[in-house]
Amino acid sequence: MFDTLLINAYVITMDEKRRVLENGAVGIENGRISFVGDTEEGKKFGAKEVIDCKNHVVMPGFVDAHGHGGHSAFKSIVEDTSYWMPVMTHTYKNYITDEFWYNEGRLSALERLHAGVTTGVCVLGSQPRCDSPVPAMNNAKAYAEVGVKDIVCTGPCHTPWPHRFSRYVNGERHM
């Protein structure tokens, strides 16, 4: 028996097929999601509390409304210091490969998923990396492959000029 059963919802799943259940249910036991499936199937288990979610969307998992691309891979480097931002901004502008953004996105998505986050926001294209769409595309590709839904926010928060950017492509630095 569930503590709570949400029924008749549009349930956006995290399964391999990324199904959307039109008459879905989510069962909760001891504060944890223990069932995601069809409403009729969920009702068979019984519940102390049943909540009708007709015409509502249920997305099992947490939503992280603020994250920054690149930071997962560097979270322990010079953290809690006054010079963290200048060091990281210089690093992002001059020493990061296109593959880094894919690998960092994968790491970040897996860490979020491990914490129960199924949807997140990734601020990526700010001043440190607004010269090319490649970082955002690679980061988003990794999130999609893991299955975490991600909203990538791109575009400069401050004008990037007169800053100089470089990228490493096939081991060669391009200015």
Where are these regions (language model features)?
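Alpha-helical scaffold segments that flank or form the walls of functional sites
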Residues: S76-K149
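Metal-coordinating catalytic core of metallo-dependent amide/deamination hydrolases
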Residues: V134-M175
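N-terminal metal-binding scaffold of metallo-dependent hydrolase/deaminase domains
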Residues: M1-F45
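A fold-wide structural signal in alpha/beta-hydrolase
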Residues: A25-G27, V63, K149
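Short, glycine/charged-enriched secondary-structure capping and boundary segments
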Residues: V20-E22, E41, I77-D80, V134-M137, ...
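Active-site beta-loop-alpha junctions enriched in small/polar residues
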Residues: H68, G125-S126, G155-P160
